[in-house]
Amino acid sequence: ELKKQEKRRKLLVVCCSVIAVACLGYFGIYNWYNIRTADNYKQLSELKDKEPATGQNQDPVIHYTADETQSTPPPVLDEYKNLLNKNKRLIGWVKIDDTNIDYPVMQTTDNEYYLDHNLNQEYDKNGSIFMDKDCDVLKPSTNFILYGHHMKSGQMFGSLSSYSDQSYCEKHPYIQFDTIYEKGLYEIMYVF
């Protein structure tokens, strides 16, 4: 009877140890992945701010927009030319001061693609910020629909939770959203 109890105790210790190692491994990989994603977006932000090399391909960019009759888009802003060379589906950049939100905005005909892919078109559980397939940056509008995950780590749109605080809203009333063709500043009207 005593030997059976000793065996059960040892088995329980081994099982608990295996579970603990598995949990530590999972959280280690999870944290590493979040750090890697943050570093990737920091590099993209630096690439955005870097001057484009002269003589880079200046061909017109074809975007996936609601109206495909637009044949000659306006010139691309210099700060987005380097990123556009990485992925022609780049449509803009969204930034909110004092948050982690400082990301490229993608657009494609498939609204689900960028739920789990990044600008480099690699699998990324954080996905990307992306514009609805039916929005057209070439048509004047005061409304664009942007999608992104609300990550618990604060990445992507995770820091939007701060807007539930009235004083935070008053201190941060604007969102900067630039298309690759023009800069834009949008006032936040409602939070829900």
Label the predicted regions.
Residues A20-F192:
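Solvent-exposed, non-transmembrane regions of membrane-associated and secreted proteins
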Residues K10-V21:
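Hydrophobic H-region at the start of alpha-helical membrane spans
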Residues E1-R8:
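N-terminal Lys/Arg-rich, disordered targeting/topogenic segments
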